[in-house]
Amino acid sequence: MSWSPILPFLSLLLLLFPLEVPRAATASLSQASSEGTTTCKAHDVCLLGPRPLPPSPPVRVSLYYESLCGACRYFLVRDLFPTWLMVMEIMNITLVPYGNAQERNVSGTWEFTCQHGELECRLNMVEACLLDKLEKEAAFLTIVCMEEMDDMEKKLGPCLQVYAPEVSPESIMECATGKRGTQLMHENAQLTDALHPPHEYVPWVLVNEKPLKDPSELLSIVCQLYQGTEKPDICSSIADSPRKVCYK
């Protein structure tokens, strides 16, 4: 699978959208400031108006995946990332890189066998370390950046330079090849094995803890489940299409 045809589109989005402030948030802040200065002046008796409704919790989206699964990469780059760009203010993402791997305890040390070989195990650990060491948004964007590329391991440095320049690729690789990487992968194995119902394939997507059978419906489901009074404009027009998965 070649990912280069979407690189220009993705790179532009990655550079522009993380810096955007959701319009709803900007509008509410400016409105509050305006109302505060015009309706309640000094020395006036200011009555309390209606209390604002508590903010609705974001929709929780959890992705259980493996780094070299083509279907996982497609979902991450073409579905999850664009959905986050469009409705980031109403969703919360959790990534669990492990997928269809298996673990065993050998003389007190955890060893892993991955569906797509040793490289996938190493990349799973790299992404687990990114999630462990970076701020959540920076980790997500760095992983998306890597997953879009053909040679993911070599793209760790360039992607970090864009989204977490204060973190060296050497520190991430030290984590991935050391005890911390093994521990993180074991924790991801436990999270994956504890799924109920168990995952049938990857990408395995949970939305508010419930399996999403058709990953292409992610944007639609997030919009439907969000209970806030104001939703992003994109929620009014959505199209779905079927996607393939990688079975065990």
UniProtKB/Swiss-Prot annotation:
Belongs to the GILT family. It comes from Mus musculus (Mouse). Its main location: secreted. N-glycosylated. Sugar chains contain mannose-6-phosphate. It is found in: Secreted; Lysosome. Disulfide bonds join 69-72. This is Gamma-interferon-inducible lysosomal thiol reductase. Keywords: Disulfide bond, Glycoprotein, Immunity, Lysosome, Oxidoreductase, Redox-active center, Secreted, Signal.
